[in-house]
């Protein structure tokens, strides 16, 4: 008879549960701050694992991209169909300082603008801003009926479409090249460029629903902390000396 363990007697107790550890105990919250070009700078909060050993939480936060509705940033429902992407560039305490990373339209807004009896015109340009950000800007426009028109349709000819597309590309290139990223963002929010395109093309063919529907960041320059702090309305923390009024002369002691 073989001598060994009796498996029936040495079975462990069933029903013992493992200790459940809440995963949120290993995480911490950080506040996301939008640039000062937006009305509401408090975007929201994000989670990340706490810093342990060689793993630093800031390394996992930098480069994180969040998508926010522009209506929440501006406090107005007029911008509810536009989405803004913000990229985390710096971690300061529990605050995450972000920069503009892109702009896009919601799908329902784009579909609602496409209708019968009109022509859709699209144009896009790849331009470098004054502060060396390479952007690809997409514009969209639709033809409309003239004031004294009887015909139901408002289709544009191919020559009109080419001429309008050329004007749109020239305006987009000029506006992006002569502005920094922060200045361009302040123009995109109130849709200043859209009105300029509409006025410039009215002699070719009247347009409606002219929008910058998308802005895509292709390349960014080397990270500059001072520029980011200025964008957020804060100093870069560098202490600079002040010039003293009047000259300073050493006193010479004649007697010891």
Curated annotation (Swiss-Prot):
Coiled coil: none annotated. GO terms for biological process: translation. Pfam families: Ribosomal_S3Ae. GO terms for cellular component: cytosol; cytosolic small ribosomal subunit. GO terms for molecular function: structural constituent of ribosome. The modification N-acetylalanine is found at residue 2. Keywords: Acetylation, Cytoplasm, Ribonucleoprotein, Ribosomal protein. It is found in: Cytoplasm. The keyword Acetylation applies. Its main location: cytoplasm. Component of the small ribosomal subunit. Mature ribosomes consist of a small (40S) and a large (60S) subunit. The 40S subunit contains about 33 different proteins and 1 molecule of RNA (18S). The 60S subunit contains about 49 different proteins and 3 molecules of RNA (25S, 5.8S and 5S). Belongs to the eukaryotic ribosomal protein eS1 family. This is Small ribosomal subunit protein eS1.
